[in-house]
A protein has these predicted regions:
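N-terminal membrane topogenic signal
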Residues: 391-405
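Hydrophobic transmembrane alpha-helices and their membrane-interface boundaries in multi-pass
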Residues: 402-475
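Acyl-thioester-dependent acyl-group transfer interface
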Residues: 1-36, 43-70, 199-382
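Conserved small/polar residues in nucleotide/adenosyl-binding loops
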Residues: 482-483
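Short, Lys/Arg-rich, polar N-terminal cytosolic tail immediately upstream
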Residues: 382-394
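Histidine-centered acyl-transfer/condensation active-site motif
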Residues: 2, 62-105, 118-122, 128, ...
């Protein structure tokens, strides 16, 4: 959320403390069970921090018991980042709206800002209920629709949380007027524009496959629920382009697909499909450490039918008195390819593009189409302190220097060993030590995981290899267990 004034961190902390009292679900960490991941309530105080990291940086680090969200601030901006295992877009926006409301009431007591309930009063149990299981029925038939493989975006991807971020602001009224002139909703209109923008970047020899977008669906619109946990599904909307295809053709197809796939019976079939696998007794009996690899393989297989993602969170509403203090709301999502997220407040709709591929051609195509449709827009300049190119270059330079030092130490040890003893026996130990140090640092940098755990596993593996070396060579000089 971008405010009309600089953020006061102390007041923001007070607002966060108030908000946490109403949303106990967020007072949880993600734990590994024997068969599934699960959320565990922890008495950890959520602390407001100044923004330093890139947007959508990793919040969940295995083996570290930390909350699955972070509230930060930078200049006039309040950020709320959340891990998707905790809640979905609707839950996140409800939390942020409550946080912003609490902050503005505390920051401007003389303004007498009205209090509005963002969600109905609920019990902690209702907030944490599993709505998927509540509405699951084994009597609902399977959706047997076969999904064709879609076009995939290609290109070298950025490392870690780094993403190409583009923020575009468009007027709601003019966009709605244009969409209605075509007889469609804003979501259908923007979906068709994104499909066309992607199509322009696909080579001719790859245009036989459809371009498909995953569109998240808020299941609370179909099945009443007070849950603040994940309760969303998705539909896949695509189009196979031909040489004679025009924008109106894509619009008409997308409109019909939305109408067909958002039918309540089909939504229920899809929702049941998400839960059916989890309810399978064979799947439930497989240990998590084995199951997670099949889950990753299944996710990769499922993504074959998707080119990109478009998520429209919808409208954020506040009383008229708040307009003097709120500029706009925006949303970004982490992605392995390309994702567009949108939300609106007042007459401003913010389009947040995130891309793992450092090429903004699709975003430029989209903005060109906005001009062609006579929709004014403003591209916001990125102002994220953790996204500076200088920071990335310094990290890479440090890593390259460390790699050179490891090689240099290994070579020097080899030279000394040969000059003094005319053998290389001890050189291999020095080289192995340098290789271990290099591996620990690189795994820590590229995987961003628990360094101590990586070191422990590495030590265990090396010890086993040493024992095997001694056993099969008969040298009995490598492993200390034999001395």
């Amino acid at each position: 959320m971008s405010a009309e004034e600089e953020v006061n961190s102390e007041i923001l902390q007070q607002a966060l403390d108030q908000t946490m009292e109403k949303y106990p679900l967020f007072q949880a960490v993600l734990r590994k069970g024997l068969f599934w991941f699960y959320l565990e309530r922890r008495d950890i105080h959520a602390i407001v921090k100044k923004e330093k990291r890139p947007p959508c940086s990793s919040l969940y680090i295995p083996d570290q018991k930390t909350l699955l969200f972070q509230v930060s601030y930078y200049k006039n901006r309040i950020n709320f980042e959340v891990y998707h295992a905790l809640t979905d877009g609707t839950g996140a926006m409800n939390f942020l709206s409550e946080l912003v409301q609490n902050y503005l009431i505390l920051a401007h007591p003389a303004a007498d800002l009205p209090w509005v309930e963002q969600i109905e009063e609920t019990t902690p149990g209702a907030q944490e209920e599993d709505s998927f299981s509540q509405y699951y029925s084994s009597d609902i038939p399977k959706n047997k629709e076969k999904k064709p493989a879609a076009v995939k975006l290609k290109g070298e991807k950025l490392l870690h949380a780094d993403m190409q971020i583009t923020e575009v602001i468009i007027p709601v009224k003019e966009t709605l007027t244009k969409a209605r002139s075509y007889g469609v909703s804003i979501t259908v209109f923007l979906t068709a524009m994104l499909l066309c923008s992607i199509h322009e970047e696909i080579p001719k020899n790859r245009q036989k496959r459809p371009i498909a977008l995953m569109i998240p669906v808020n299941l609370r619109n179909y099945f009443p629920s007070q849950s603040m946990g994940n309760f969303f599904g998705w539909i896949e909307v695509g189009y196979t382009f031909a040489d004679e295809t025009v924008f109106q053709d894509v619009l008409e197809s997308v409109k019909n697909q939305f109408k067909d796939k958002l039918d309540k019976e089909k939504v229920a079939m899809d929702m049941n499909g998400y839960v059916r696998l989890e309810k399978n007794p064979l799947v439930r009996a497989v240990p998590l450490e084995i199951k997670k690899y099949f889950m990753m393989a299944g996710a990769n297989l499922g993504s074959r039918s998707v080119t990109a993602v478009y998520s429209n969170i919808g409208i954020l509403k506040f009383p008229e008195e708040y307009k003097a203090y709120i500029d706009r709301f925006g949303i970004f999502a982490s992605t392995n390819s390309l994702q567009l997220c949108s939300c609106s407040y007042g007459d401003q709709m913010v389009l947040g593009f995130t891309s793992k591929i450092p090429d903004d051609s699709i975003q430029k195509n989209f903005m060109r189409m906005l001009r062609e449709e006579e929709i004014p827009y403003k591209e916001e300049k990125n102002d994220f302190p953790g996204c500076g190119e200088q920071n990335k270059k310094e990290e890479i330079k440090i890593l390259q220097t460390f790699t050179f030092l490891c090689l240099a130490v290994a070579v020097i040890c080899g030279m000394i060993n040969y000059l003094m003893l005319e053998t290389l026996n001890w050189f291999w130990f020095a080289a192995a030590g340098c290789a271990c140090a290099w591996l620990v640092v690189n795994v820590a940098y590229f995987k961003r995981r628990n360094i101590l755990k990586n070191l422990t596993w590495q030590l265990l593996i090396i010890t086993i290899l040493c024992v095997l070396w001694d056993h099969f060579t008969g040298w009995k000089g490598c492993c200390l267990l034999y001395t």
